[in-house]
Design a protein with these regions (language model features):
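Structural motif
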Residues: 1-2, 31-34, 72, 138-140, ...
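Electropositive, surface-exposed helix/loop patches at the edges of structured domains
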Residues: 172-187, 250-274, 311-325, 376-396
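A conserved active-site cap/scaffold subdomain adjacent to cofactor or substrate pockets
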Residues: 241-289, 294-296, 305-307
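Glycine-rich beta-alpha junction loops
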Residues: 38-40, 222-224, 277-282, 292, ...
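Nucleotide/pyrophosphate-binding catalytic subdomain
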Residues: 1-255, 263, 389
Length: 416
């Protein structure tokens, strides 16, 4: 069995949906499960809905209408029959979204976020499943929330592997083409949970692990895994073969092509991960697999923008040792801060973090009880794997270096 994953960019419009059908016809879809993300920038648009629910109720209906208009435009291009069942199915999903927002009593942002954000994937898979069925690619639509079970850590849930594997092996018919949603799960109370932004790759890996799949293929708008993001670097190179360990390192440091959690379940069963272009589906792409070293072995650049650099120092010039460092990390964990790089000396501690949950104020309140804290926002973190002097110079030229850390062949540089 094989697992395919199509991200939002691949299904951002009617042409993208038709291209998915063409790819399936050309590469084959027997014994396949397809994981699909929300269309285009729908997740971002649903985040606007969540924010307006909490802060600008008067804009709530308008923001939902924007998402409706976007999807109905795609539906009208794909389905000529105005009485097609896809209309009432999508109508029902939007009604469910509106009903939740009217009934909800929870003040918890992360809980509301997950109950709202899931509609992007539910709507996209409904449209695509219907279109494929109409065009001779018969498939079964599956609500992934009935299969992937998690804890209740909304927005970044952890998988209950035992229950999830039992559900998937019981309910997935390997002989059929199955279509399901990425990024989503549900907790013990059947409330929707999410696996972290860009978590659809992880969903594909979960299914691959549980079904002992032969491979996972992620279809993207790039030719494969490049050694740098072409939006920010010139003369990028395609990485043809990547060892699992190297891919995990790249993902950990923030390489955007592969979700960090995706690789661990695949490595455990040595399931190869292919990254291929939906623009040029006949091209070979990249393979993450059981090879001894990176091919070609070149410096790899990872860029993370909009980071926050926190510089802590003790108020009385006492050492920042185990107890103080423990307090710092407990505070970071409580604020759901993702640590990108740390550096410490006897009386100072610097940490670069990703404030994706908007909890900086909460974190500072705790840290300032114990330390003097300096905050530098909007910094950029560069990580270079297999760094060379020339690669380091490429990053540092013309920039103000705030922090630099060198470990083996990995260099991390924070710049203003």
């Amino acid at each position: 069995m094989q697992i395919f994953k199509f991200g939002g960019a691949s299904v951002k419009d009617a042409a993208g949906v038709r291209n998915v059908a063409k790819i399936l016809e050309n590469v084959g879809y027997a014994n396949t499960l397809i994981v699909i993300s929300a269309m285009g920038k729908t997740t971002n648009a649903l985040e606007v809905v969540v924010n307006s629910y909490f802060k600008e109720q008067e804009k709530l209906a308008e923001n939902i209408q924007v998402i409706k208009d976007f999807h109905y435009h795609i539906i009208r291009e794909l389905f000529t029959d105005e009485n097609h069942p896809v209309y009432w199915k999508v109508d029902g999903l939007f009604a469910e979204l509106t009903s939740f927002l009217e009934r909800n009593k929870s003040p918890k942002h992360s809980f509301v976020y997950d109950q709202v954000i899931c509609f992007g994937e539910l709507i996209s898979t409904t449209i695509i499943s219907q279109f494929l069925n109409d065009n001779g690619i018969k498939n079964t639509w599956i609500d992934v929330r009935n299969l992937v079970k998690t804890d209740s850590n909304y927005r970044d849930a952890s998988i209950d592997w035992e229950e999830t594997q039992s559900n998937i092996r019981t309910h997935i018919n390997k002989s059929l083409l199955n279509i399901t949603q990425g990024f989503l799960g549900s907790d013990a109370n059947f409330f929707t949970t999410t696996l972290g932004r860009e978590g659809s790759d992880y969903t594909a890996a979960i299914f691959a692990y549980c079904l002992d799949a032969e491979s996972v293929t992620i279809w993207k708008d790039v030719p494969g895994v490049l050694n740098a993001d072409p939006r920010y670097f010139e003369h990028t190179e395609l990485l043809h073969k990547i060892p699992y360990k190297e891919a995990i390192e790249l993902a950990f440091y923030g390489a955007s092509v592969i979700h960090p959690k995706t690789l661990q379940p695949l490595q455990q069963k040595e399931i190869p991960l292919y990254v291929r272009s939906f623009v040029n589906p006949t091209a070979e792409g990249s393979a993450v697999c059981n090879v001894p070293e990176l091919e070609p072995k070149v410096p790899c650049f990872i860029l993370k923008k909009d980071q926050i650099l926190l510089s802590l120092s003790s108020r009385d010039f006492s050492f920042i040792v185990e107890e103080g460092i423990s307090y710092i990390f407990k505070s970071l964990h409580k604020a759901q801060m993702k640590v990108s790089v740390i550096q410490n000396s006897a009386i100072s501690f610097s940490v670069c973090v990703d404030n994706k949950f908007d909890t900086l104020a909460e974190l500072l309140e705790r840290l300032e009880e114990r330390f003097k804290v300096s905050v530098t926002e909007k910094v950029t973190l560069y990580t270079i794997r297999h760094a060379t002097p020339a690669a380091i110079q490429t990053v540092e030229t013309g920039k103000t270096v705030l922090l630099k850390q060198v470990a083996a062949d990995t260099v991390q540089i924070v710049v203003a």
